[in-house]
Amino acid sequence: MSMLCYTLITAFLIGIWAAPKSEDNVPLGSPATSDLSDTSCAQTHEGLKTSRNTDQRHPAPQKAEDQELRTAANIIVDPKLFQKRQFQSPRVLFSTQPPLLSRDEESVEFLDNEDSLNRNIRAKREDHPVHNLGEHSVCDSVSAWVTKTTATDIKGNTVTVMENVNLDNKVYKQYFFETKCKNPNPVPSGCRGIDSSHWNSYCTETDTFIKALTMEGNQASWRFIRIDTACVCVITKKTGN
């Protein structure tokens, strides 16, 4: 009798140990597995949504230069700032449309038009004209209106130039009239017309400082910046001559 009871108790215990102890042992398709899958998917979706929201709240860091340039384009300029403008240069123009050179491309005029902030200026600059008398320039140059985002100021520091100016709900672009060399060596020996047997020569740009509208902190301010204004010939005497 005792042996029979011992056998029944042992069989009962083996049956209990063989029973599933967690949802991990539940067959696929059972309610426990479905709930677990749904919970896991919900947690994954919630995690992705949280990560996406976190990225929106904390965007990737941007370069300081890019942020400053974007700020410069959105700043609204007080018209009184132009009344305080001094040392006005004909090489700086604020306009809503790209300025054009004259037809012969040898001079430039600032016309009185309502799309320009330089209405009181009318200037003309020569671009090394070649006359019909057999005259030639020592160096060949080219002039054009350009825009700038950075420049070197009179102290040698790199500053941010305002490319776009928002004035009275109208966006003006700041243009600069620059002159550059077409080629440092217009002829194989260097500058044109230089005696290469006694002199070394080459063409290079020279610059000048003009007043331009720049960014200083979060405010617009006038500052002297450097631009190229001419192409000249540099000569050095050859040694042994």
From Swiss-Prot:
Positions of the propeptide removed during maturation: 19-125
Cellular component annotations (GO), alphabetically ordered: axon; dendrite; extracellular space; synaptic vesicle
Region annotation (Disordered) ranges: 47-67
Family the entry assigns: Belongs to the NGF-beta family.
UniProt feature coiled coil, ranges: none
Annotated disulfide bonds: C139-C203, C181-C231, C191-C233
Subunit details: Homodimer; non-covalently linked.
Subcellular compartments: Secreted
Signal sequence region: 1-18
Protein known as: Venom nerve growth factor 2
Keywords, comma-separated and alphabetical: Cleavage on pair of basic residues, Disulfide bond, Growth factor, Lipid-binding, Metalloenzyme inhibitor, Metalloprotease inhibitor, Protease inhibitor, Secreted, Signal, Toxin
